[in-house]
Amino acid sequence: FTFVIDKLDQDETGNALNSASALAREVRQVVIPEVDTYTYNKMVTGAGTKPDAITLTKDNIYTEIIKAGNALDNAEVPETERVLVVTPDVHLLMKQCADITMETDIGNDMRLKGVISNLDGATVVKVPAARMPKDFGFMLCHKVATVAPTKLEDYKVHQDPPGINGTLIEGRICYDAFVLENKAKAIYYQANKPAV
């Protein structure tokens, strides 16, 4: 990416528009979402266990998540460092599920803090639906299954380059993600069939 902050614009905003904040915003709002979207799509595509899509509800969400945990257990995936990736809509279902909120230690913690952060030994990570494939339900995974190398990540800020009265900001990031074939069973992906 490349963009310019003109000196006049910077001056008129009382220095609120400056190169450091603009670069940080670009990384936060563009680069990170793009890399996340790419990596999550690779993980979903390469998941070793993908049962048929079902309609997730507050009544079945807990059962489906512990089924995923059972599948990872049977595939001999380490129990530590598992991550449950959910969208805000699925997280809402989890909060509405009596099996989670009323009958578990997690429920006690949630009532105190108002958030579900761990379920069935997995850290719960809520990711915006826009970064996930269409009809994403949830994904239970372990870090051994995916590698996401960043080959190059370089950002430059040039003050008054030729032809520009201001700051030229450039960034370049080269990345990829791979699901290791022999570790694919460490990813369980459940698609969510929209309710009719």
Language model segments and positions:
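Extended, solvent-exposed, turn-rich assembly/linker loops in the middle of proteins
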Residues: A47-V115
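Alpha-helical scaffold segments that mediate packing/assembly in large oligomeric complexes
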Residues: K7-A75, Y188-V196
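Residue-level marker of positions within ordered structural domains that often coincide
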Residues: I32, D89, C174
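Sequence/fold signature of self-assembling virion shell proteins
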Residues: G14, C97-V196
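Intrinsically disordered or highly flexible coil/loop and linker segments, enriched in small
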Residues: D36-Y40, P78-E81, F178-V179
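Short amphipathic
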Residues: F1-V4
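Residues at beta-strand starts and edge strands
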Residues: S21, T80, G163-T167
